[in-house]
Amino acid sequence: IRDDLAKAIKNTNLVEIYSKGTNEQFSVGYVIQQDEKFVLVQAVNVDGELDGLVVFRKASLARVISDTDYLKSMATIIALAKQRGYYDVWNTERLMNKLLKKQNKTKHSLLKTLLKQAFHHDQVIQLSGRIKKHGDSYAGFIHSEHKKYIEFNYVDMFDLAKRPQIAIRYAEIDEASFHSFETFNTTAVIESFMPGDFH
């Protein structure tokens, strides 16, 4: 996988990224950078829009594929999004450049760099992996950082009065994303219904 990722970075290829245990579900995006354990991807949604930055744990990935018919179709959809002006509605490319500058000045992993960015700027992130039950995904914000874990406040869209908080070890996180449609939607919910918890 490391070689496939290196090739995708070098050629700026659009790729399909499959996580272990999911044969049919995959993410689409541009591989930006990798370190020993993690890879940073600029995600693209089915409408051809940039949909946040995602850090994947490489050990959780099954395969990375480029040059499929689906990706050729996606390239056309991305071209339309660029032409019509909705490719990068959240200024993801600007954020990515800032994140890369920080990453180049630090000894932290890509995962910790993304988590620190989210924590210091009070940004909602989405985390998934082996948290509580395998495959669970949580959107919320980091309450506090510790050496081996974070205290994470997540949003339960079905019970807005709840204020669930869980401790998540860095080792449990297989995927972390922010600056996406989902995280911006969750931010709007937090600001509307729990403004005292946030900022």
Set out the residue ranges of the language-model regions.
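N-terminal beta-strand/beta-hairpin edge segment
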Residues: 30-47
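Short beta-strand-centered aromatic/proline hotspots
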Residues: 25-33, 136-144
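Short aromatic-glycine-enriched beta-strand elements
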Residues: 37-41, 148-153
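Residue-level signal for tight coil/turn positions that link beta-strands
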Residues: 35-36, 146-147, 170
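Short conserved catalytic/interaction loops centered on acidic-Pro-aromatic/His motifs
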Residues: 137-140, 150-153, 161
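Short glycine-rich, low-complexity segments
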Residues: 1-26, 45-51, 55-134, 156-199
